[in-house]
From Swiss-Prot:
Main location: cytoplasm
The keyword ATP-binding is annotated on this UniProt entry: yes
NCBIfam families: argS (TIGR00456)
Top-level class of the enzyme under EC nomenclature: ligase
Listed name of the protein: Arginine--tRNA ligase
Subcellular compartments: Cytoplasm
Assembly and interaction partners: Monomer.
Organism (species): Ligilactobacillus salivarius (strain UCC118) (Lactobacillus salivarius)
Keyword list, A-Z: Aminoacyl-tRNA synthetase, ATP-binding, Cytoplasm, Ligase, Nucleotide-binding, Protein biosynthesis
InterPro entries: Arg-tRNA-ligase, Arg-tRNA-synth_N, Arg-tRNA-synth_N_sf, ArgRS_core, DALR_anticod-bd, Rossmann-like_a/b/a_fold, tRNAsynth_Ia_anticodon-bd
GO cellular component: cytoplasm
Family: Belongs to the class-I aminoacyl-tRNA synthetase family.
One of the GO BP terms on file: arginyl-tRNA aminoacylation
Sample GO molecular function, one term: ATP binding
Length: 563
């Protein structure tokens, strides 16, 4: 049962419909402290209609409200505070979580509508750095959240698999590379060749000319050039997939930049037909002055198309292919202007579906407030960070529980999960500092702390033995359980909020609050005591385990049963 709706209904009856249930729902608040009740309604929203002081309205409402199902309803100043019947509430919430299991919190907001999500998008022949983490894990969590409320997410890894760098790479490979080296370690060796090309071309400018020729061959469909390009792409993708597997992420499409090579002419033709292309200093632009934006540069003076032309082709292709209800681009906030231009050009082309395109921006990962990189300025590789996190997790497991079965598997889940959780607990628009020792701690507001809380709940259930929970005996009178019960009830609303704000941090913060409340309850209660409420207490533990596990799943984090 949605208790907020119940509160709104009794208020609506008490004010004889002078305020709609929808308006009442929008005004109902959750008091910050439990002594002020579970819900509060500010009576001053009625003072204009009723021409009375808010305090008087609050007192009169308390007299009129049907208090059935509430422990009490009282006026405190201009507020009407509602205290829920704790036994009824615990019975309702626990039976709902127990019966629905991992489906608890599922909703039908999306009606099965398609939502392509452009995310991750590393460059071929370059390693995935920590810079790729945010787009990858935010995009994945949004996909899981959208799926929970019945959208159909389509995860697209828009690979950086085209550009003049491939001419350089082909030249470098032919001069200094070998098939064996590429197969043994594709990314690092391809990067090594590329770096050497730039070192050598300082004294050999003819290398640049050769690279341009090879890229021209690639554009013209030369068999050897295409074969090498495809091979570099495949070998790189194999390596990326190893990282994605560790993050438990799969994609529905790997269509990258190259896929749209034959789709850009249509865009320039359409812009021409609609009279939107204008010449400016030899280049072709779309004027976006009415949107307070700089002109969108469509084609350079040498006839080469640009990044935005490719993105226009991708947007049109995705609309035609998926008939999307929303289309998301999980890309850093430095690209905000680019996406404003993209939407404005599509709008000028007459495509109203451009309103359903959303840029999901995010901040940087920093170290000591500066952009994350090693002392030498080298990028920090994502795979190395995951390895280091797993080692730290392993060390802590050895200290806390050396006899744990499947230690390596649990350390992988905890280490990788810690890195993902730390990213997602931060509001995505904010930049945040990354310190691995802080991230992989089992205490504080961390992923391992939430995982450990789930494992603790599972341990209690194992100690209870093969207990068949009685769904008719779920009343808890213990006030220590109240905060945990209230948080369990808030899970569906949390999911809804995270989806509407495209904000996984809402779920991560919720998981931390639920874990804290449960651990406090655990410290104060004898859960396995044989008394009339033992069944209800174990039902609460089961419900916490289910909800913590599902919260972590929505973030792309595993929940080990033992730690």
């Amino acid at each position: 049962m949605d208790y907020k709706v119940k509160v709104a209904q009794v208020i609506e009856q008490a004010v004889d419909g002078k305020l709609s249930q929808e308006d009442i729902l929008a005004k109902i608040e959750k008091p910050k402290t439990l002594n002020l009740g579970d819900y509060a309604f500010p009576a001053f929203v009625l003072s204009k209609v009723l021409r009375k002081a808010p305090q008087m309205i609050a007192s009169e409402l308390v007299e009129k409200i049907d208090q059935t199902g509430f422990e009490k309803v009282e006026a405190v100043g201009p507020y009407v505070n509602f205290f829920l019947d704790k036994k009824e509430f615990s019975k309702d919430i626990l039976s709902e979580v127990l019966s629905e299991g991992s489906a608890y919190g599922n909703q039908d907001l999306g009606h099965g509508g398609n939502v392509p999500i452009d995310m991750s998008s590393p460059n071929i022949a370059k390693p995935m750095s920590m810079g790729h983490l945010r787009s990858t894990v935010i995009g994945n969590s949004l996909a899981l959240l959208l799926e929970k409320v019945n959208y159909k997410p389509i995860k697209i890894d828009h690979l950086g698999d085209w550009g003049t760098q491939f001419g350089k790479l082909i030249v470098a490979y032919k001069l200094w590379g070998s098939e064996e080296e590429v197969k043994a370690d594709p990314i690092n060796n391809l990067l090594k060749y590329y770096v050497r090309f730039h070192e050598e071309d300082v004294n050999n400018p003819e290398l640049d000319e050769e690279a341009r020729e090879w890229f021209k061959k690639l554009e013209d469909g030369d068999e050897e050039a295409l074969k090498l390009w495809k091979w570099f792409r495949e070998e790189s993708l194999k390596k990326f997939t190893e990282v994605y597997d560790r993050l438990n992420i799969t994609f529905d499409s790997y269509n990258g930049e190259a896929f749209y090579n034959d789709k850009m002419d249509e865009i320039t033709d359409l812009l021409q037909e609609k009279g939107l292309l204008k010449e400016s200093q030899g280049a072709e632009i779309v004027d976006l002055e009415k949107y307070d934006l700089n002109p969108a540069l469509i084609r350079k003076t040498d006839g080469a198309t640009l990044y935005i032309t490719r993105d226009l082709a991708a947007a049109l292709y995705r609309y035609r292919t998926y008939d999307f209800v929303q289309s998301l681009y999980v890309v850093g906030q430095e690209q905000t202007n680019h996406f404003k231009q993209l939407k404005a050009v599509l709008k000028e082309m007459g495509y109203d579906w451009s309103d359903d395109i959303h840029h999901i921006p995010f901040g940087l990962i920093t170290s000591g407030g500066k952009k994350l990189s090693t002392r030498s300025g080298r990028v920090i590789l994502l795979e190395e960070v995951l390895d280091d996190a797993v080692k730290l997790a392993n060390k802590q497991i050895e200290e806390k529980n050396p006899n744990l079965a499947d230690k390596e598997e649990v350390a992988e889940a905890v280490g990788v999960g810690a890195v993902v959780f730390h990213d997602l607990k931060n509001e995505r628009i904010n930049s945040f500092d990354f310190n691995l020792d802080e991230v992989v701690r089992f205490e504080g507001e961390t992923g391992p702390y939430v995982q450990y809380s789930h494992a603790r709940a599972m341990s209690i259930l194992r100690k209870a033995g093969d207990l068949e929970l009685d769904s008719d005996n779920l009343e808890i009178s213990d006030p220590e359980a109240w905060q945990t019960l209230r948080l369990l009830a808030a899970f569906p609303e949390t999911v809804k909020k995270a989806v509407s704000e495209y904000e996984p941090s809402v779920v991560a913060k919720y998981a931390i609050h639920l874990a804290k409340a449960f651990n406090k309850y655990y410290a104060h209660s004898r859960i396995l005591n044989d008394d009339a409420e033992k069944n209800a207490r174990l039902a609460l533990v089961q419900s916490v385990a289910t909800t913590l596990k599902e919260s972590l799943r929505l973030l792309g984090v595993k929940a080990p049963n033992e730690m």
